[in-house]
Curated annotation (Swiss-Prot):
Any one cellular-component term (Gene Ontology): cytosol
Name of protein: tRNA uridine 5-carboxymethylaminomethyl modification enzyme MnmG
BP GO terms, sorted: tRNA methylation; tRNA wobble uridine modification
Cofactor: FAD
Amino-acid positions noted as binding FAD in the UniProt annotation, renumbered to this chain: G18, A19, G20, H21, A22, G23
Binding site for NAD(+): 280-294
Subunit structure and binding partners: Homodimer. Heterotetramer of two MnmE and two MnmG subunits.
Places the protein is found: Cytoplasm
Function: NAD-binding protein involved in the addition of a carboxymethylaminomethyl (cmnm) group at the wobble position (U34) of certain tRNAs, forming tRNA-cmnm(5)s(2)U34.
Alphabetical list of Gene3D superfamilies matching this protein: FAD/NAD(P)-binding domain, GidA associated domain, C-terminal subdomain, tRNA uridine 5-carboxymethylaminomethyl modification enzyme MnmG/GidA
Keywords carried by this UniProt record: Cytoplasm, FAD, Flavoprotein, NAD, tRNA processing
GO molecular function: flavin adenine dinucleotide binding
PROSITE patterns to which the protein is assigned, alphabetical: GIDA_1, GIDA_2
Amino acid sequence: MIGLRPEDDRVYDVIVVGAGHAGIEAALAAARMGFRVLVLTVNPDTVGWAPCNPAIGGPAKGVVVREIDALGGEMAKTTDETMINVRMLNVSKGPAVRALRAQIDKISYSRTMKRKLETNPNIVLRHGIVERILTEKGRVKGVVDNYGIDYLGKAVIVTTGTFLRGKIFIGRSTFPAGRMGEFPATKLTESLIELGFEVGRFKTGTPARVLKRSINFSVMERQDTSDEPLAFSFFDEPRVLPKDYPCWLTRTNPETHSIIKQYLEFSPLYGTVKLIEGIGPRYCPSIEDKVVKFKDKESHQVFVEPEGRDTEEYYLNGLSTSLPYEAQIKMIRSVKGLENAIVTRPAYAIEYDYIDPRQLYPTLESKLVENLYFAGQVNGTSGYEEAAGQGIIAGINAALKLRGEPPLILKRSEAYIGVLIDDLVTKGVDEPYRLLTSRAEYRLLLRHDNAHLRLAKYGYRVGLIPKWFYEKVLSLERRINEEIERLKKVIVKPSDRVNDLLTSLRTSPLKEPVSFYQLLKRPQLSYSALKFLDPNPIDDPEVVEQVEINVKYEGYIQKMFEEVAVFEKYENYEIPHDLDYDAVPNLSTEARDKLKKIRPRSIGQAMRIPGINPSDISNLIIYLDRKKQ
């Protein structure tokens, strides 16, 4: 960028509005694919900030982080660099729901992400609050910031998080903010409405922070980092972290709930003067929500989590609230271990604008303005991981379109990111959307352990994954298949030695010869247990893990692949984007209206639109078949 004239410094290939988790992945993807990127943000010192819990991952979300990594994104690597406590969740529940969750040093995470943006030669990170989207003949042209500066770009990606007309609530006190301590974007919503976007209002919240020295950890349950070496990124060597930053578990009690009920009338959500209109997240309710909706529960869990190495603040996971400050102090100090808590930052709720994601294509490009993309919380989602997953897809697709190449659309059967985006653009949102394992029909195929096997080919195709890594994935795939075939051919015959081992492992002895493949199907037996009988076992733990899962769950996996084949039949049945739905006979009025609005790209997507019934689909297929003849 050295030596650029001022006018050149206002012209870019891609402009990213916002530098949160979605904006980071979008900017890095487009820049690494060779395009000049401008990132405009309210505060360049809070890039990739974690305004709520200082953690990355969890059920479904942790798999998304691995998928981002497999596509060539940054979240997994930076989490590995900055995590202070990490655990594998749901180990006893099987591979379909296993996921990593890490406590991050939130200050270090933000600084690391800022450095990665600033050191990329194709990225300029700059302060600016975007107030208007510039368009020309139905195509995006650029943006205007709060200084009145016009920036021109061939593509614009909006990743504004909670900043669109953001408003904070603490009891009956309310003030404009994008998040605590930062200005909101007050004018951009008006520009989006002028362009035809439908805008709604959601709310979320965050708990108070308390000072470490005021916490009595001795009466809480300690939760240390894992003893097993772990890593989010496929590029990083798994490691065991020092046990310097444990999390702690305590609980609310009847006194806590009594205090909450006493102050409900001052709540902006439940009070006599209801100030909050936006709908909050179902799966991350405030403590007052939990007390009101679950009256029979005498206690709720509170996880006391460190915010980082260079701060003494702790996060009270489970005590999100918008009650008045006085009520917060009393409530917190009623909890075991927090009797003398010093609150450093109050809890608050925040209300913000989002756009209806049904106005987007599965590429995350807007249907209303060409080359205008949206990603993250502005699309009605909640969570850092969901935002980052959308961000990398928006960045990749903006770059692919500028290259003149086909877009990247992940299927529901390929990735949790595919499930997330398909749900958004097909069904829309009436509450903040959180990704859950239950939302994925094919979750046994979308595992934590196989994200690179599923998605590295796409990362390599678009230029975000290096050749050596892709070849490593192909080699791994080959070795897995070879080992499965070998196990089918190696026969074990009944003998005293064999049966003694099987009996000691609490499984039935052999009466006739069987293959190692058949033996490994037994739930009591692992690959390592059978090594004593195997003349030529392998030692690669990554291959062993995949072999075990594929052998033990073969029936379920095969059934899912059969379901995917049916699913893809309808996914591959394309619907012309300009189809005149008024010409399709016998559609219900509701179906016709929704098909016009969403304009599904395939019969498969049309089938997932709420309110579209089987007879509507049949009539649509009949009409399309006749048009083809």
